[in-house]
């Protein structure tokens, strides 16, 4: 496959979102400890990673400890405002470097996308970045993809979108005529498309396989 532009999702596509969750939970626990004088770090880790309470985590914690639900918003803010460095997947930087000859875009529905890019140290790799929550929209809106393609001056037929979540990542770019590639990795590994037009054109299990699909060649060896 030869393309003139490659666009990426961010969470679980270029890095492991669980690392973002871990650092965010630490920051939220630090803030709660500053308010209460008690440590809830272990409880938050248990709820999120062991009991898999990934929605309403802070509500559940506050309920368990009979603390005011009014603290939820502040804890969510601390979670997303964490500043600890994040690490891309080991092969991410090498893959992006190998794609330097074509424009690169990034489209993410994840809150705090700009903060994540800075913490990952890969912002400068991208020629166009759209973080949909800042625009009060999502990747379900074709305008999001059209905006990036216009900024990169390429047509949909010349572009590819790489993502991981078949619920949201592929339907719109498929409809626009973009090629789509799923990285089956991360939180949504076991989720299958619920409709035909949400299925990707290609599927890979390791990001450096993208170079093979795009006929770019193998990346330079990376340190693990």
Regions flagged by a language model, labelled:
Residues 1-6, 98, 103-224:
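Asp-based, Mg2+/Mn2+-dependent phosphohydrolase catalytic module
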Residues 2-94, 115:
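N-terminal helical cap/lid subdomain that shapes the substrate entry/recognition surface
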